[in-house]
């Protein structure tokens, strides 16, 4: 494995910082995390993306805080940002005005870099560029005395190229957003009209490549910069086999769900049971609250955050729905601290009137001791109440059993699932069809775990035995039956923060790092690695992800949100279409969903009740300056059939999580096929509705589903309904003798306004505010 550039900034950072922060408050600091850059033997030989974000500089200045007080955490992060700036700025001023300035030019260069990084953190790229330019100029002068740093001048060119490209994004994509901005490959509407940023980026990238022509990362970034100017190439990543797939359109802005925030989770669910799917998003920014967008049923959404009592729910790297009290109202669980430092999570009870109450402490789930990125709900002991596995980073993960009275007990030790790892994802699923929910845990920087549920309240770890411990650098994960054989398969995304590996993929070069993994259930209690056979031996640095059926053919497709904290991590998100359970095709370009901005919480859902699944993505980066508009990709529809099934438990948990659905479908020629689903919200970073949307294909005998079978986890009953009309919404209650037709009014999602010149009002935004 290669370390990233042997850059002077890294060489001198520790020495300079030790001078400036060896103060009486040094022991009052929060523990800091360098986990983004961790490596592990066996994960591949790859180059990590150049760091331009300021997150390291600001995190160094973080001091003590109250992990249970969300406002305290917000203030502590603000203070850290200001402290980092004042420290570097003050030291630079003193050094530049000292008699030793000429002798200590390298330190001056490093301090300019540090200030450039801090301004980048805030998103003020004009000021960041001022410091990066000043640092480059000083370094060029210093080479007369320090020729050993000549190569580092080349990497400052890359930093400046990235910074100018980001400035171009801010001027064109963020401040003057339209539905085509940052959709790869860029259309004419997506090209930059304010070209100063990209033009300067091209200059610096070319300067870098004149010295380092083999740097694939910079070649990729140069190509993107050229594309924003109307040149460049889209590469050849999409599979070329002709496939009919719909092209989606981003309608987040006209529908009112395009809130500009940092990275976070996304839940699409009908929170008030009015028949329309609503949206809740979180933000990793400790000063940004949850946002609740209520579906009005007319193509638009209303922001009910304040009314819902969610304005004080600050921060949250991820979120997921549950129904912990079995009242039929979807509750919310918010996870915090992932990639950062320990802080509290939140359990929010749905009151049934579009308001929520924080019951974290009352439920027994309040803690400030952990960093959490993932949590997953299931009834692991089949007592009819949803339990929760909370996956922590580095500290032992926890399993909480629902007592059925609104409180939880920690049964981690008894269950045997408390291993310590840097856990980034988890998913429940009954992979061996024995009626008990099993648990898969995805770890970043180590082997993954598969816990087999023994049915007595304890689990056996069988991951290594069954060969499902990889990727070693993994992130989101899920169980799904991709081949419709009635047995859950396992998908695990890799997270290798390497732009070079993405470029290699587009150039048709073999990967040098870990790829994603698809494990096919062998129906004998184990799995087979079919990644290569399924066409998925690709390196995609995945963060948010989920699965759904984009074309109603009945086979589950999936979407991968990509990125890393650095502004240099510009790569498309990816859509993969399932080819009848045999393999997957990259249909990113064809579907128009290849957003270049960073993809986090992902949900597939029918937002307009028209019988196809749309795609909601929480777009935005990890740092405050990398906020972006969320995306709602509207599905244009197709001629294939579908059914939406809402299950309601009685003896089993009310949300029916873990219940199994089997559809028998007969086409017009008499051929029989099957569809299988297990009720979940999907992947571990993004939550789709619990009501199951199931595609049926284009040809149905008499327009009906031959049979619907439901298997319930607690009562062990199996319901069967025959000759059910397709293309409708139904509800099936546990033990009921018939299903209920649900009235669901369809409507059109608001569309972007047509404009001959989408950039007519372009004006670059300026910032003069200091941190």
Segments from the language model and where they lie:
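Short coil/linker segments at helix-helix boundaries
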Residues: 66, 71, 138-154, 162-207, ...
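Short, conserved, GDST-rich strand-edge loop motifs in beta-rich repeat architectures
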Residues: 169-193, 335-340, 493-511, 561-569, ...
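Helix-turn-helix repeat elements of alpha-solenoid scaffolds
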Residues: 77-96, 124-141, 194-202
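Short loop/turn motifs that recur once per blade in beta-propeller domains
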Residues: 249-262, 283, 302-314, 339, ...
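Hydrophobic beta-strand segments that make up the repeating blades of beta-propeller
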Residues: 266, 278-283, 328, 332-337, ...
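Gly/Ser/Thr/Pro-enriched helix-cap/hinge segments flanking short amphipathic alpha-helices
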Residues: 534, 583-598, 603-771
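Beta-propeller blade termini
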Residues: 263-273, 294, 316-326, 372-382, ...
